[in-house]
């Protein structure tokens, strides 16, 4: 409890004017639970003090006191920043709105009834002065006012809970020095005073007549034991001229110990009842045997409270009785000295043989009751329920799962007489548990498993290969697989299709390797890239086509594949005639020309493609070279067939010469309707799908395939 607070100020003897002697306090309410003691010299002053009203202390006085209090504080000094100041929280006290309501109801009682009810209590006179500034703080504090004529006109206010020593003065001196002024006891005197000095009207909020909405309702959670805090309250009671000090404790209690309204009224009005302070907190006393035990931390208490709330909520649901019973047994085990983290739900570990789910209701009741049953009774019960347990296990496992487990046991070298490897989802067989010698689930059996030892023995007998040695992968044969088909024609066709598929895969692999070397296998690679579009080289027609597309489009940049020095020069000359900026970038075989659009570049609309093509053809008319191979593609150089134009050029024969195993003419397109030979055959009655020859002598439907062979030569070479 806090120490007493003393407030001392000078009171001039000659001053009889009405003033407030408390510069930072304000009288808010006066009750009849405390006492004021004063000598003869201050009687007139206290009479004026008793008739104080809240309006005597104006806002001007409040501003003056506040300004003088905060003028030289650290907040306005400027030496300390606001963010560096600590934040101190001041408690507003313990609120008791019910007592305020009782006082309001008592004020409404007629004066006659109040005089009769207080006739027997005139010997006890108490005055309560509330010194709390906050309106929410309604804790009644003890205020003892001592006025001594020998103290040179000084007044001391003491807030204390210590008892006065009645033996220090004689009864005659006490009778001469003590005077009591009842402010609220006599209703008639107070009504007369109010008629002369009416108190200010305080507006009272009327209850709303509208029905409350469920969305605006506030549900208060009472919480746990944290709210059961006592607030000490000191009351000075004077009986027969002797002042005594008693301390009461405000303790919220449950519904079972809460007294009724009639009992509270009778106890409050009874003058013989004096509240007695409880010096010790209510709680369970610990025995000396548990004094040496390690105290529980706050986290443990919080976990216990959470678990207690969970059990209370689960107990309301009848479907969760089993879980509630198990959790209740868990709490009992912890109280008996068990581990705080040991949760025993009646089942063992995942490798243990006994399972709670496999037990019947009678067996669970027998185990939970803890009654002493003989081993013979347990054996008889196990033998009677053995068939039922096996049926339940067989029902849980389907045929597919059982076959898989049996196959796994055969791989491990185990017999199929007893099922050993059983997963958790299928439950656990009790037959193996009884054969292993376990009749009851004991703590020692939780750490051992008969199945684990059986599996370990089975693995010890196995001759496993050395897994550290890498197993070489079987190389795929280049020969076609054996299809094992009786029909030779179908088998030959399958082998031919297989070989063609292998060739196509090989070609795609070579193409990917080429593109990977050029960096064209990126995720952002565009199929319109000229390096992808022309993997081998470009013709003069390709130059003109790409230049026309660049002039019509709105692209700012066009990059060509790597070309030799003469090819780059030809492209620069064509670009210069249309005011297109051209520049070569890269080194060695990767040097390539790049075209850039400028402000002076001649542009064409999409509908002007004919005009653009005509101008580009006129600009490339004097170019004698017709083919421009890529400089970054390596390959043998040879003579190229003449295409009817002047001049010749040496190009890469990689795109013109067939590879090993390719079929000649396999990629040749079908002859169209404009072909003269096909038109002549169609006039003679031939159509697609018909064989050539007479009706009796049909020719072949498929042409004779010619496969390129370079590795071997001569007859009989395959």
Swiss-Prot record:
Residues 247-301, 341-404, 430-452 are annotated as: Disordered. Residues 375-400 have a biased composition (Acidic residues). Residues 673-718 form the G-patch domain. Keywords: Cytoplasm, mRNA processing, mRNA splicing, Nucleus. Residues 265-282 have a biased composition (Basic and acidic residues). Belongs to the SQS1 family. Residues 537-599 form the R3H domain. PROSITE patterns: G_PATCH, R3H. PANTHER family: G PATCH DOMAIN CONTAINING PROTEIN 2. The keyword Glycoprotein does not apply. One of its GO terms (cellular component) is cytoplasm. It is found in: Cytoplasm; Nucleus. Its main location: cytoplasm. Transmembrane segments: none annotated. One of its GO terms (molecular function) is nucleic acid binding. This is Protein SQS1. Residues 442-452 have a biased composition (Polar residues). Residues 283-293 have a biased composition (Basic residues). May be involved in splicing.
């Amino acid at each position: 409890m806090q120490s007493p607070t003393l407030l001392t100020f000078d009171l001039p003897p000659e001053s009889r004017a009405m003033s407030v002697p408390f510069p930072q306090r304000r009288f808010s309410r006066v009750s009849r639970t405390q006492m004021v003691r004063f000598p003869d010299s201050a009687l007139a002053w206290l009479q004026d003090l008793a008739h104080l009203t809240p309006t005597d202390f104006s806002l001007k006085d409040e501003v003056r006191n506040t300004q003088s209090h905060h003028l030289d504080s650290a907040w306005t000094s400027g030496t300390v920043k606001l963010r560096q100041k600590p934040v101190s929280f001041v408690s507003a006290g313990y609120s008791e709105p019910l007592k305020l309501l009782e006082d309001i109801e008592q004020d409404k009682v007629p004066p006659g009834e109040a005089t009769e009810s207080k006739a027997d209590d005139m010997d006890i006179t108490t005055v309560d002065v509330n010194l709390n500034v906050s309106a929410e703080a309604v804790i009644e504090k003890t205020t003892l006012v001592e006025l001594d004529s020998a103290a040179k006109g000084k007044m001391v206010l003491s807030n204390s809970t210590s008892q006065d020593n009645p033996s220090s003065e004689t009864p005659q001196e006490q009778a001469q020095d003590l005077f009591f002024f009842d402010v609220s006891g006599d209703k008639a005197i107070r009504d007369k005073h109010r008629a002369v000095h009416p108190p200010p009207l305080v507006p009272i909020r009327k209850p709303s007549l509208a029905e409350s909405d469920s969305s605006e309702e506030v549900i208060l959670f009472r919480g746990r034991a944290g709210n059961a805090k006592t607030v000490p309250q000191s009351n000075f009671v004077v009986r027969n001229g002797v002042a005594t000090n008693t301390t009461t404790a405000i303790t919220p209690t449950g519904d079972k110990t809460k007294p009724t309204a009639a009992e509270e009224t009778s106890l409050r009005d009874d003058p013989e009842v004096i509240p007695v302070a409880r010096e010790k907190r209510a709680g369970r006393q610990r025995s000396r045997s548990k004094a040496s035990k390690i105290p529980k931390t706050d986290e443990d208490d919080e976990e216990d409270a959470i678990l207690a709330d969970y059990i209370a909520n689960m107990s309301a649901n009848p479907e969760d009785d089993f879980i509630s019973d198990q959790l209740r047994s868990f709490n009992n085990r912890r109280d008996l000295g068990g581990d705080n983290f040991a949760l025993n739900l009646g089942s063992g570990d995942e490798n243990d043989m006994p399972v709670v789910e496999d037990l019947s209701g009678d067996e669970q009741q027998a185990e939970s009751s803890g009654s002493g049953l003989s081993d013979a009774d347990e054996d008889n019960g196990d033998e009677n329920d053995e068939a039922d347990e096996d049926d339940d296990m067989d029902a849980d496992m389907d045929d597919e799962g059982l076959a898989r487990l049996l196959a796994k046991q055969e791989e491990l070298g185990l017999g199929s007489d007893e099922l050993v490897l059983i997963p958790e989802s299928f439950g656990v067989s009790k037959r193996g548990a009884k054969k292993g010698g376990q009749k009851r689930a004991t703590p020692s059996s939780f750490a051992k498993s008969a199945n684990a030892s059986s599996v370990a023995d089975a693995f010890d007998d196995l001759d496993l290969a050395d897994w550290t040695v890498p197993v070489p992968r079987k190389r795929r044969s280049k020969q076609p697989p054996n299809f094992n088909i009786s029909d030779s024609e179908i088998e030959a066709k399958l082998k031919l299709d297989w070989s063609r598929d292998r060739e196509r895969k090989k070609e795609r692999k070579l193409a990917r390797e080429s593109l990977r070397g050029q960096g064209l296998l990126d995720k952002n690679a565009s199929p319109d890239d000229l390096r992808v579009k022309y993997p081998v080289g470009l013709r003069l027609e390709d130059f003109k086509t790409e230049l026309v597309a660049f002039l019509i489009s709105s692209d700012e940049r066009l990059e060509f594949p790597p070309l030799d020095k003469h090819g780059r020069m030809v492209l620069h000359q064509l670009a210069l005639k249309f005011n297109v900026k051209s520049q070569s970038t890269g080194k060695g075989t990767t040097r390539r020309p790049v075209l850039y659009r400028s402000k002076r570049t001649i542009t064409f609309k999409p509908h002007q493609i004919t005009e653009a093509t005509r101008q580009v053809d006129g600009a490339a008319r004097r170019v004698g070279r017709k083919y421009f191979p890529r400089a970054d593609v390596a390959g043998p150089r040879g003579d190229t067939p003449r295409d009817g134009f002047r001049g010749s050029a040496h190009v890469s024969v990689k795109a013109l010469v067939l590879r090993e195993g390719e079929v000649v003419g396999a990629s040749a397109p079908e002859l169209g309707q404009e072909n003269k030979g096909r038109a002549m055959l169609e006039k003679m009655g031939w159509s697609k799908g018909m064989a050539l020859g007479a009706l009796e002598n049909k020719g072949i439907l498929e042409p004779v395939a010619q496969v390129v062979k370079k590795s071997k030569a001569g007859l009989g070479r395959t």
